């Protein structure tokens, strides 16, 4: 398999592919934290949760993508 800068190419469904689409492929788009005043409003209502059968796998790949390990095998889908 091909790796790009130590990052494997992660395809759909959290499966590694041969491309260079690994985590942090575009460093200029990486997460940065801005310092700003924030207000947190706490409520007493229970959190709203919705579970759709079969949607968990796609949501993990869509929201986080894959984190590829050094041996070009996908680790848990938790790259953000």
UniProtKB/Swiss-Prot annotation:
Metallothioneins have a high content of cysteine residues that bind various heavy metals. It comes from Coffea arabica (Arabian coffee). The gene is METAL1. Belongs to the metallothionein superfamily. Type 15 family. GO terms for molecular function: metal ion binding. Pfam families: Metallothio_2. Keywords: Metal-binding, Metal-thiolate cluster. This is Metallothionein-like protein 1. InterPro entries: Metalthion_15p (IPR000347).
């Amino acid at each position: 398999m091909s790796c790009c800068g130590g990052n494997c190419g992660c395809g759909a469904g959290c499966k590694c592919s041969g491309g260079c689409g690994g985590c942090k492929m575009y460093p200029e788009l990486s997460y940065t934290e801005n310092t700003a005043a924030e207000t947190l409003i706490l409520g007493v209502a229970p959190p709203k949760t919705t579970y759709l059968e079969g949607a968990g796998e796609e949501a993990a790949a869509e929201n986080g993508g894959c984190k590829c390990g050094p041996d070009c095998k996908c680790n848990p889908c938790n790259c953000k």
